[in-house]
UniProtKB/Swiss-Prot annotation:
Its cofactor is Mg(2+). Its EC number is 6.2.1.5. It comes from Proteus mirabilis (strain HI4320). The keyword Oxidoreductase does not apply. This is Succinate--CoA ligase [ADP-forming] subunit beta. Heterotetramer of two alpha and two beta subunits. One of its GO terms (biological process) is succinyl-CoA metabolic process. Pathway: Carbohydrate metabolism; tricarboxylic acid cycle; succinate from succinyl-CoA (ligase route): step 1/1. The gene is sucC. Coiled coil: none annotated. Succinyl-CoA synthetase functions in the citric acid cycle (TCA), coupling the hydrolysis of succinyl-CoA to the synthesis of either ATP or GTP and thus represents the only step of substrate-level phosphorylation in the TCA. The beta subunit provides nucleotide specificity of the enzyme and binds the substrate succinate, while the binding sites for coenzyme A and phosphate are found in the alpha subunit. ATP binds at residues 46, 53-55, 99, 102, 107. NCBIfam families: PRK00696.1 (NF001913), sucCoAbeta (TIGR01016). One of its GO terms (molecular function) is magnesium ion binding.
Length: 388
């Protein structure tokens, strides 16, 4: 679960980290009032969406008057911001952040993730702030410095100082950086985060460090013990189909193709999308119904898939281990009858009672094509989608 920039900065302030004074605003009037509370300009106004690249898309602007603030708010509030990280529809802008402008002398990067390779929280720091860290890692990896957090000792101040020295910081900047490092590490561990990022972490012309931007990602598996973080969830930033799927504990990710995919198991779902691509098709989604592929969940999965108007055929790929394929077939038949599916449905069943399940599908009299293998299923669904 991602947070907005203003929410991240509110947390930073609570943990004693330096961030510009600012207010999240939902109306042009609130934006003007926020500028008055902050004091004399210039100010920076920022669209609040869960996506990077806002500046290049016009969603961040330095302004010198309240008239400019109102104009920016009227331009973006209620609209959608399209960046290189969004799809063609963009993300809805329901709030803008108004904050004091900062005199920037240098931009740095500081962030942390859970590294699966080391099974540790790893901090990364770089002198290349203000740009995508993925680009830095690809083009100049030597400019990224790391600190691995030992789970037994937790973050240590010396690690922050080491990173500061590697970044070329001097004097009071070193102690400020170490304090920010320790604060971020505390937030990361106490709030069950999967990602924390300040990009850029800036050095001002007075040699002070300021958290100019903030990005936080909370581990969704830990939300049950993070009620405050859960309250910060903004459903407007999610694909409505993904939100609906989450309510049924379905793992759904919308894609740009025209072949809907329903699979039990994340690995099998990835393999299914690969083989659809191999045979010339384009998956419309990733959808893992999990081990409990009941009729109700299969029905809901069909509804979610078919809510995408680009879908012209559906591939159902089920491997029956503990789950019996004949019961899955009953669920698919019932779901197709209830939902009223009007596109071809190709089903591949393998495993426990697969033959009986395939026979039930063939005898159903519905527009369901029983495939003999995964390759056969991919070929048939691609052909059906092209014919549609």
């Amino acid at each position: 679960m991602n947070l907005h920039e203003y929410q991240a900065k509110q947390l930073f302030s609570r943990y004693g980290l330096p961030a510009p004074a600012g207010f999240a605003c939902s109306t042009p009037r609130e934006a003007e009032e926020a500028a008055s509370k902050i004091g004399q300009g210039p100010w920076v106004v920022k669209c609040q969406v869960h996506a990077g690249g806002r500046g290049k898309a016009g969603g961040v602007k330095v302004v010198n008057s309240k008239e400019e603030i109102r104009a920016f708010a009227e331009q973006w509030l209620g609209k959608r911001l399209v960046t290189y990280q969004t799809d063609a529809n963009g993300q809805p802008v329901t709030q803008i952040l108004v904050e004091a402008a900062t005199d920037i002398a240098k931009e740095l990067y500081l962030g942390a993730v859970v590294d699966r390779g080391t099974r540790r929280v790893v901090f990364m720091a770089s002198t290349e702030g203000g740009v995508e860290i993925e680009k830095v890692a690809e083009e100049t990896p030597e400019l990224i410095h790391r600190a691995i957090i030992d789970p037994l000792t937790g973050p240590m101040p010396y690690q922050g100082r080491e990173l500061a020295f590697k970044l070329g910081l001097k004097g009071k900047q070193v102690s400020q950086f170490a304090k920010i490092f320790m604060g971020l590490a505390t937030i990361f561990l106490e709030r069950d985060l999967a990602l924390i990022e300040i990009n850029p972490l800036v050095i001002t012309k007075d040699d002070d460090l300021i958290c100019l931007d903030g990005k936080l990602g909370v581990d969704s598996n830990a939300l049950f013990r993070q009620p405050e973080m859960r309250e910060m969830h903004d459903p407007s930033q999610e694909d409505p189909r993904e939100a609906q799927a989450a309510q049924w504990e379905l793992n759904y990710v919308a894609l740009d193709g025209n072949i809907g995919c329903m699979v039990n198991g994340a690995g099998l779902a990835m393999g299914t999308m690969d083989i659809v691509k191999l045979h010339g098709g384009e998956p419309a989604n990733f959808l893992d119904v999990g081990g409990g592929a009941t009729k109700e969940r299969v029905t809901e999965a069909f509804k979610i898939i078919l809510s995408d108007e680009n879908v012209s055929a559906v591939l159902v790929n089920i491997f029956g281990g503990i789950v019996r394929c004949d019961l899955i077939a009953d669920g698919i038949i019932g779901a197709v009858e209830e939902v009223g599916v009007n596109v071809p449905v190709v089903v591949r069943l393998e495993g426990n009672n697969a033959e009986l399940g395939t026979k039930k599908l063939a005898d159903s009299g519905l527009n369901i094509i029983a495939a003999k293998s995964l390759t056969d299923a991919a070929k048939q669904v691609v052909a059906a989608a092209e014919a549609k």
